[in-house]
Amino acid sequence: AETLVAAKIVKDVKSGVKVLANGELTAKXLTVKVAKVSAAAKAAIEAAGGSVEEA
């Protein structure tokens, strides 16, 4: 979450970040550490060779 705030992708993180599936995932071997993730987003990340860690 701190990385997203530092990159000015989000303004503030109080309760963590939830990743939702919307659009096309072009990154490969992406590792994501988030509070929540939708099933579709998790499947897309894993299909692209990445991994998801839920806090």
UniProtKB/Swiss-Prot annotation:
InterPro entries: Ribosomal_uL15/eL18, Ribosomal_uL15/eL18_sf, Ribosomal_uL15_CS
GO molecular-function terms, A-Z: rRNA binding; structural constituent of ribosome
SUPFAM superfamilies: Ribosomal proteins L15p and L18e
GO cellular component terms listed in the entry, alphabetical order: ribonucleoprotein complex; ribosome
Gene Ontology biological process terms from the UniProt entry: translation
Keyword rRNA-binding among UniProt keywords: yes
One family name in Pfam for this protein: Ribosomal_L27A
Keywords linked to the UniProt accession: Ribonucleoprotein, Ribosomal protein, RNA-binding, rRNA-binding
UniProt key word Cytoplasm: no
Similarity comment: family membership: Belongs to the universal ribosomal protein uL15 family.
Function: Binds to the 23S rRNA.
Subunit structure and binding partners: Part of the 50S ribosomal subunit.
Protein name stated in the entry: Large ribosomal subunit protein uL15
Native organism: Lactococcus lactis subsp. cremoris (Streptococcus cremoris)
